[in-house]
Amino acid sequence: MNFHEYQAKQLFAEYGIPVPAGRIASSADEAVTAAKSLGNGPWMVKAQIHAGGRGKAGGVKFCKTTDEVKQAAAAMLGTKMATYQSAGVALPVNLVLVTEAGEITKELYLSVLVDRGTRSITYIASSEGGVDIEHVAAETPEKIQTLNVDFVEGLQPYQGRDIGFHLGLEAKQVNQLSKIMISLYQLFNDKDLSLIELNPLAILSNGDLYALDGKINSDDNATFRHKELAAMRDKTQEDETEVLASENDLNYVTMDGNIGCMVNGAGLAMATMDVIKLNGGEPANFLDVGGGATKERVTTAFKLILSSNKVKAIFVNIFGGIVRCDMIAEGIIAAVKEVGVKVPVIVRLEGTNVDAGKQLLATSGLAIIPADDINDGAKKAVAAVTV
């Protein structure tokens, strides 16, 4: 799950990580009130969307007067903003964050993530903040420091100090960085996060470190035990179809093709998309209906797939292990009738009671195209969209 900047900063503050004072606003007048409550300025007005790169898109403004605050907020709120990090999607700006604007002397980069290669929580730090870390890694990799944390010992204060010395910080800042890193480690573990990014982690004119911008991602599989994080979810920033899928316990990801996929099991779903690609087609989605492919779940799955007008055919690829193929076939038939599917439907069944399932499909009176195996089904799906 993604979070807004203001939500990330709320969590930072709870764990003692220094952040500029700030308030959110949903209107230009509220933004002015927020600015006045923070002092005499200057201020930063920042659009709150689930994407980075807001500055280049006009979503971050430096304001010296409350009139400028009002103008900046009015220009952002109620609009949709696309950035180079939003994957071509324009996201709605429903809130702005108004913060104090400190005088920056140096920008650093600091992140915490799970490194699958080393199977550890890993810190990435750089003396080059305020820019994409990927660019730094490509152009000046010597400016990046990494630290893999031993999961038994945990992060030790000396490790944070060592990173600080390598970044060229002064003694006071080295100690501040060590404390920030320890706080981030605790936050990361307490909340089951998958990413924390401070970019920039800035040195202000008084010599202190502050997290001027922050990004947090949490592990969706752990959300059930963090109701306080679940309450922060902003569905307006998400794909509507994916939101509906999650509400029905379906794993759905929108893609760019025209062949809808309905599969039980994530591994089989990925294999199905691969075989479609190998046969010259393009999948329109990833959709795992799970082990219990009931009529209700299959019906919802068809509705999700057909919510995209790009879909020209649907490939249903089901392996009946625990669930019998005849029960799955009944669910498919009922769902096709209820939804009123107008595009070709190719069905491949395999597993328990497969013959009974195929017989039900064959005698259903519906224009369902049977497939013998995954490759046959993919070929027929590709043929259906290229007619």
Swiss-Prot record:
Belongs to the succinate/malate CoA ligase beta subunit family. Residues 9-244 form the ATP-grasp domain. Mg(2+) binds at residues 199, 213. Keywords: ATP-binding, Ligase, Magnesium, Metal-binding, Nucleotide-binding, Tricarboxylic acid cycle. It comes from the Bacteria. One of its GO terms (molecular function) is ATP binding. Its EC number is 6.2.1.5. It catalyses: succinate + ATP + CoA = succinyl-CoA + ADP + phosphate; GTP + succinate + CoA = succinyl-CoA + GDP + phosphate. Its cofactor is Mg(2+). This is Succinate--CoA ligase [ADP-forming] subunit beta. Binds 1 Mg(2+) ion per subunit. ATP binds at residues 46, 53-55, 102, 107. Succinyl-CoA synthetase functions in the citric acid cycle (TCA), coupling the hydrolysis of succinyl-CoA to the synthesis of either ATP or GTP and thus represents the only step of substrate-level phosphorylation in the TCA. The beta subunit provides nucleotide specificity of the enzyme and binds the substrate succinate, while the binding sites for coenzyme A and phosphate are found in the alpha subunit. Heterotetramer of two alpha and two beta subunits. Pfam families: ATP-grasp_2, Ligase_CoA. GO terms for cellular component: succinate-CoA ligase complex. GO terms for biological process: succinyl-CoA metabolic process; tricarboxylic acid cycle. InterPro entries: ATP-grasp, ATP-grasp_succ-CoA_synth-type, ATP_grasp_subdomain_1, Succ-CoA_synthase_bsu_CS, SUCC_ACL_C, Succ_CoA_ligase-like_bsu, Succinyl-CoA_synth-like. Substrate binds at residues 264, 321-323. Pathway: Carbohydrate metabolism; tricarboxylic acid cycle; succinate from succinyl-CoA (ligase route): step 1/1.
